[in-house]
Amino acid sequence: QKCCSGGSCPLYFRDRLICPCC
């Protein structure tokens, strides 16, 4: 999985709110 806007999938829930995993 990767961040929807690019980069690796965030590890922490609060970061996933900013950059969801796709």
Swiss-Prot record:
The keyword Secreted applies. Disulfide bonds join 3-21, 4-19, 9-22. GO terms for cellular component: extracellular region; host cell postsynaptic membrane. Keywords: Acetylcholine receptor inhibiting toxin, Disulfide bond, Neurotoxin, Postsynaptic neurotoxin, Pyrrolidone carboxylic acid, Secreted, Toxin. The modification Pyrrolidone carboxylic acid is found at residue 1. It is found in: Secreted. GO terms for molecular function: acetylcholine receptor inhibitor activity; toxin activity. Expressed by the venom duct. Negative results: does not inhibit mammalian neuronal alpha-3-beta-4/CHRNA3-CHRNB4, alpha-4-beta-2/CHRNA4-CHRNB2 and alpha-9-alpha-10/CHRNA9-CHRNA10 nAChRs. The cysteine framework is III (CC-C-C-CC). Probable competitive antagonist of fish muscle acetylcholine receptor. Inhibits postsynaptic nicotinic acetylcholine receptors (nAChRs) from fish (zebrafish and goldfish) and frogs (IC(50)=0.1 uM). Protects these receptors from block by alpha-bungarotoxin and alpha-conotoxin EI. Does not block nAChRs at the neuromuscular junction of Rana pipiens. Shows a weak inhibition on mammalian adult and fetal muscle nAChRs (alpha-1-beta-1-delta-epsilon/CHRNA1-CHRNB1-CHRND-CHRNE and alpha-1 beta-1 gamma delta/CHRNA1-CHRNB1-CHRNG-CHRND) (IC(50)=3-45 uM). This is Conotoxin MIIIJ.
